[in-house]
């Protein structure tokens, strides 16, 4: 397997997540969920800025008008970076105060797919929603525990999805026009010693780059054969998500976490919670934006 080199961006996130590449701004965004922080790192200047919100901030991605789309607790909002104005768009599970949003992405039609979990991590308490132009969340999957990473194939015929505790990446038939999904097969089974699958992204070769929580790296899996192809080894235990970006879409931004680490472990792994940049030999695609 290839050996990768990395550079790190000091962030010290308790729970870093949701890396997103903004083409217009040529910068990476990510969040620190429990601390409600939104980070922006300009790739050329190396400058990092932080904005804080009085909510758990679980997701950042792009809207069709250049605004950001944020998930805060159980609500989705648009955020104008120039005015810093937040506009609420929709909400789910208002009757489940222990639940919050987790990971999310947009499909090629601009629909937002976003999952929930219980902050107590109660088994089966999470769901996966699809949100279209009418801003009405429609439940697609239920009985989830930690709704997490997702990706679509280039032909838009397969949707990959992770419910973290299952240690599986599932493949669903995907119908682009309607947004319907139907379970097809388990694409990847992840053994216990490799940790838990968390966030993921897909490259132009159709391979899945998966952050392994408790697995000290990002693992590249072949979802057709289920085989592990390679691994980006990182000096932290809890790797949470990854996304392609940069001018050539060949830079992987990787988020990590400090949660569930003791004081001694944090001394042993001081870069936990920081963000890592890794150049790869494969490229990703620009993330789809939310159309509403």
List each model region and its residues.
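Hydrophobic/aromatic beta-strand positions that recur at structurally equivalent sites within the blades
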Residues: 31, 41, 79-81, 129-131, ...
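Conserved beta-strand positions in repeat-built beta-propeller and related beta-rich domains
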Residues: 22-23, 28-33, 69-74, 112-122, ...
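A short loop-to-beta-strand structural motif that recurs across blades of beta-propeller domains
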Residues: 37-39, 75-77, 126-129, 168-170, ...
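Short loop/turn segments immediately following beta-strands, especially the blade-tip
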Residues: 172-180, 223, 280-285
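Beta-rich, blade/repeat-based domains predominating
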Residues: 11-25, 54-69, 95-111, 140-158, ...
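Blade-level signature of beta-propeller repeat domains, shared across WD40, Kelch, NHL, RCC1
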Residues: 243-292
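Hydrophobic alpha-helical segments and helix pairs
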Residues: 85-142
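A short beta-strand motif characteristic of beta-propeller blades
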Residues: 4-10, 46-52, 87-94, 136-142, ...
């Amino acid at each position: 397997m290839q050996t990768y080199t990395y550079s790190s961006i000091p962030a010290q996130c308790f729970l870093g997540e949701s890396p997103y590449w903004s083409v217009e701004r040529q910068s990476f965004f990510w969040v620190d969920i429990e601390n409600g922080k939104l980070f922006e790192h300009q790739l050329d200047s190396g400058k990092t800025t932080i904005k804080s919100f009085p909510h758990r901030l679980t997701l950042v991605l792009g809207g069709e008008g250049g605004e950001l789309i944020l998930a805060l607790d159980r609500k989705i909002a648009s955020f104008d970076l120039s005015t810093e104005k937040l506009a609420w768009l929709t909400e789910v599970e208002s009757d489940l105060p222990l639940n919050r949003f987790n990971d999310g992405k947009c499909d090629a039609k601009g629909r937002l797919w976003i999952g929930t979990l219980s902050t107590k991590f109660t088994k089966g308490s999470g769901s996966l929603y699809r949100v279209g132009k009418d801003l009405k969340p429609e439940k697609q999957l239920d009985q989830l525990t930690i709704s997490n990473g997702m990706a679509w194939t280039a032909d838009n015929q397969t949707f990959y999805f992770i419910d973290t505790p299952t240690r599986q990446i599932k493949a669903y038939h995907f119908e682009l026009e309607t947004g319907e999904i139907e379970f097809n097969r388990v694409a990847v089974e992840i053994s216990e010693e490799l940790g838990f699958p968390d966030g993921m992204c897909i490259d132009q070769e159709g391979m899945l780059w998966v952050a392994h929580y408790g697995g000290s790296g990002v693992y590249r899996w072949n979802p057709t054969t289920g085989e592990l192809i390679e691994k980006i080894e990182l000096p932290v235990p809890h790797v949470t998500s990854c996304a392609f970006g940069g001018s050539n879409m060949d830079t992987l931004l990787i988020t990590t976490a400090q949660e569930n680490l003791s004081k001694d472990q944090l001394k042993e792994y001081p870069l936990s919670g920081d963000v890592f940049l890794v150049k790869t030999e494969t490229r990703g695609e620009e993330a789809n934006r939310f159309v509403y």
